[in-house]
Design a protein with these regions (language model features):
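GH16 jelly-roll
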Residues: 1-168
Length: 168
């Protein structure tokens, strides 16, 4: 598999949760598992960005919601994080744009997802048994967490978005 994925999981508990993300392949087509790489996530109010070897490959932003004079939500950006599910009690389709917990404390999970429906969804052949032979392992050299300041005028943090980048 020559892809990595930056994915947000948010909303209610399964099965009413949601996720969104972006795949990235190395420019030369090589397998990311063949060597160590530097992965980074920048998280600031209303936006999360993913990098591999200093290359920005994905951005997710909070949905923007406007309200009409009747107080009804309009203008929901379906490019941001939001959830839609059928309410069990009423059977109505419910849309929530306020279920993204990225303005609250949470913890980080570093994992190698190989089970469930994920392999078949992203790789037509499913799990490759050869990936688990000859002593293969999932190795992490180090994890660092930094807090970057924000520009008091713009509110932007970290300031590392590359010029010409178009977010999701």
């Amino acid at each position: 598999e020559a892809h990595i994925y930056g994915t947000l999981h948010y909303g209610q508990e399964w099965p009413n949760n949601d996720s969104s993300g972006q795949a990235y392949s190395l420019p030369d087509g090589s397998n990311p598992a063949d060597d160590f790489h530097t992965y980074a996530i920048e998280w600031q109010e209303g936006e999360i960005r993913w990098y591999m070897d200093d290359y920005l490959y994905a951005t997710q932003r909070r949905s923007e919601v406007r309200y009409n004079s009747n107080g009804e939500a309009t203008g929901l950006s379906h490019r941001g994080w939001y959830t839609e599910y059928f309410e069990q009690g009423t059977g109505e389709l419910v849309t929530h744009w306020d279920n993204a917990p990225y303005d609250q404390e949470f913890y980080m999970i570093l994992n190698l997802a190989v089970g469930g429906s994920w392999p078949e969804a992203v790789n037509e052949t499913g799990i490759d048994p050869e990936a688990f032979t000859n002593g293969q392992s999932f190795e992490i050299d180090y994890v660092r967490v930094y807090e970057c300041g924000s520009d008091p005028e713009t509110g932007a943090g970290c300031e590392t978005i590359r010029p010409g980048y178009d977010s999701l």
